[in-house]
């Protein structure tokens, strides 16, 4: 199947965003600590922890920093009771947004999220107001690679779809349950993905013009800057022509 890479387009200016490395590290360390506290420090038994550690390694976090965070999670922790919360809302053009947070103060977090939406022309909705527009799935992306080899291995292991994009990148789509198996088989076969995660994929996307895209990206940037934000999902489609002008 051919297409246009959603990852290479809409994971909005990640090269620029990743310049905020210190903030990214702080968020990832908190996620590692909490995941280890909730599910234990062994990645064989804690898939959530494995995903977060893979993200940390992908941004060049040192292994001893990761190990120390896991140890903190297995120990006394810091006394705070964090909970996972998902907020849902709409932005310009009817774009749907979901924000996954780790919060130790629900009232503060919802106030911060609501303020971000209102400031940038969006509206915070109720639980379930946009989540029905998304499906949970595994996503394994390769910048380039042997398409036939990737396709053969992935399909043999039960991948749902293989997408060859206009920029020659390749995306493997899996069920959440098959994600780790397929990713591990591809990796052990010498096929190292540029990005891999279990994500929420929208059923369809809303294309934004330059004006709406500028305002939309300001909302996304604001949400990403909040300490409590863990992950953002949305169904906006910003063309390459518009993206280069942001």
Swiss-Prot record:
InterPro entries: Integrase-like_N (IPR017856), TACO1_YebC-like_2nd/3rd_dom (IPR048300), TACO1_YebC_N (IPR049083), Transcrip_reg_TACO1-like (IPR002876), Transcrip_reg_TACO1-like_dom3 (IPR026564), YebC-like (IPR029072)
Cellular-component GO terms for this entry: cytosol
GO molecular function, one term: DNA binding
Keyword Iron-sulfur belongs to the record: no
Keyword annotations of the record: Cytoplasm, DNA-binding, Transcription, Transcription regulation
Pfam families xrefs: TACO1_YebC_N (PF20772), Transcrip_reg (PF01709)
Subcellular locations according to the entry: Cytoplasm
Keyword Transcription belongs to the record: yes
BP-aspect Gene Ontology terms: regulation of DNA-templated transcription
HAMAP family assigned to the protein according to its UniProt record, in alphabetical order: Transcrip_reg_TACO1
Family: Belongs to the TACO1 family.
NCBIfam families for the chain: PRK00110.1 (NF001030), PRK12378.1 (NF009044), YebC/PmpR family DNA-binding transcriptional regulator (TIGR01033)
Protein name: Probable transcriptional regulatory protein Rmag_0394
Organism lineage string: Bacteria, Pseudomonadati, Pseudomonadota, Gammaproteobacteria, Candidatus Pseudothioglobaceae
């Amino acid at each position: 199947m051919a297409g246009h890479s959603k990852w290479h387009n809409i994971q909005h200016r990640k090269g620029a965003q990743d310049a905020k490395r210190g903030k990214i590290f702080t968020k990832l360390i908190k996620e590692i600590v909490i995941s280890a506290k909730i599910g234990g420090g062994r990645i064989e038994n804690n898939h959530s922890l494995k995903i977060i550690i893979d993200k940390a390694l992908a941004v060049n976090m040192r292994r001893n920093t990761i190990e120390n965070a896991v140890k903190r999670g297995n120990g006394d922790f810091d006394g705070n009771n964090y909970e996972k919360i998902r907020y849902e809302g709409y932005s310009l053009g009817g774009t749907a947004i979901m924000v996954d947070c780790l919060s130790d103060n629900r009232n503060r977090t919802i106030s911060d999220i609501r303020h971000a939406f209102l400031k940038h022309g969006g509206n915070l909705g109720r639980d379930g107001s946009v989540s029905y527009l998304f499906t949970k799935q595994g996503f394994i992306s390769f910048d380039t690679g042997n398409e036939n080899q990737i396709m053969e291995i992935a399909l043999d292991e039960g991948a749902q779809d293989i997408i060859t994009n206009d920029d020659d990148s390749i995306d493997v789509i899996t069920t959440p349950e098959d994600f780790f198996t397929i990713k591990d088989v591809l990796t052990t076969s010498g096929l190292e993905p540029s990005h891999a995660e279990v994500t929420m994929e929208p059923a369809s996307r809303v294309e934004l013009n330059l004006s709406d895209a500028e305002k939309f990206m300001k909302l996304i940037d604001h949400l990403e800057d909040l300490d409590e934000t863990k992950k953002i999902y949305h169904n906006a489609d910003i063309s390459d022509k518009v993206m280069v002008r942001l």
